[in-house]
Every structure is written in C-alpha cells, then in structure tokens.
Amino acid sequence: MAQDAQNLIWIDLEMTGLDPQNDAIIEIATIVTDGQLNVLAEGPVLAIHQPESVLDRMDDWNRKQHGESGLTERVRRSTIGEAEAEHLTLGFVSEWVPPNESPICGNSICQDRRFLARCMPRLEAYFHYRNLDVSTLKILVERWAPALKEGLQKQSTHRALDDIRESIAELRYYRDTVLKI
C-alpha cells in the first residue's frame, strides 16, 4: 500500500445523539477507496468506551437502535477510548492518503465532522477542508428525479462499517444513473 492523493477516506461515526457539544462518539469505522470508488482497504471498526452516565443520556431512538444492534453492549465492554480510537484510525488512513488531500467522505458527513472537531481534532485536521457528502446527491434526486430513488436499496443498520459500505454503493448508483459518468 502506498499513499495516493487521489484515494478517498470514508468515515462513519455512531453517536449517543446528534448534539456535538453534549453527545459522544461510540463507534468509528473507515474505508479507503480509489478515486473510482473501488475499496482498497477497510480500517479498524472500533467501539469506543463511554461511561454509563453518558449512555444513560441517550434518547429513546438511540437507546433502542444501539441496544438492538448490540453496539451499546460493545461500548460497555470496550477498553478503547476516544484518544486511542483517533490514534488507530489516523495510523490506518495515513498509510493510504497524505494529510490534507482527501475530503472527508460519507453521508451527512458534516455531522460526523463536527463530532471529530470536538472529540478527535487531529483526525479531523487530517482531512482536506472539503466534504464529499453523498447526502447532497440524495437530496437533489429526491427533489428533481424521485423515480430514480426507487432503484436504491439501503439496509440502514446504523452500524458504522455498514453505513460506509452503503454510502459508497449509493454514490456508485448516483454516478451510474444520475451523473452517467
């Protein structure tokens, strides 16, 4: 594996809620693709330990979702904190992409970036300032070509690695059907 500035870093976080100032990251995963969206490597998938007091603040949706997926229990058992998760993830992405080259890639990625800025600032700073947000295309298709949305199937497990795989597949779908490039 060699660093390539054309590679893309895909990231997804699972959090205890949507408020970057008060909620916490509980899972992080990364995938690196080439510029044509071919997966080159999957990074570590890490459940991040949070104290019970943090987990207790989850709203009903998050409590149900992360409880049913098993993530809440993985978080309780995890010995990995945010700093170690940041270090391990940086170690992975730095093998594939030089600093400040890849946009941060994913779905609704601005939300993840806000959490990274507070909880994992070195990782957030590793990305280019631009975002490759698949949600932008999703919103445009919903408004301008809603019939095209029917061809897209998503599982929506709300597990970080699954969500990244679905984001990459979704962008491929938009490239092939909407952008036709």
Curated annotation (Swiss-Prot):
Residues 8-171 form the Exonuclease domain. Keywords: Cytoplasm, Exonuclease, Hydrolase, Nuclease. It is an enzyme of class 3 (hydrolase). CDD domains: Orn (cd06135). GO terms for molecular function: 3'-5'-RNA exonuclease activity; nucleic acid binding. Pfam families: RNase_T. GO terms for cellular component: cytoplasm. InterPro entries: Exonuclease_RNaseT/DNA_pol3 (IPR013520), Oligoribonuclease (IPR022894), RNaseH-like_sf (IPR012337), RNaseH_sf (IPR036397). The active site is at Y129. It is found in: Cytoplasm. The keyword Nuclease applies. GO terms for biological process: DNA metabolic process. Its EC number is 3.1.15.-. The keyword Nuclease applies. HAMAP family: Oligoribonuclease. NCBIfam families: PRK05359.1. 3'-to-5' exoribonuclease specific for small oligoribonucleotides. PANTHER family: OLIGORIBONUCLEASE, MITOCHONDRIAL (PTHR11046:SF0). Belongs to the oligoribonuclease family. This is Oligoribonuclease. It comes from Methylococcus capsulatus (strain ATCC 33009 / NCIMB 11132 / Bath).
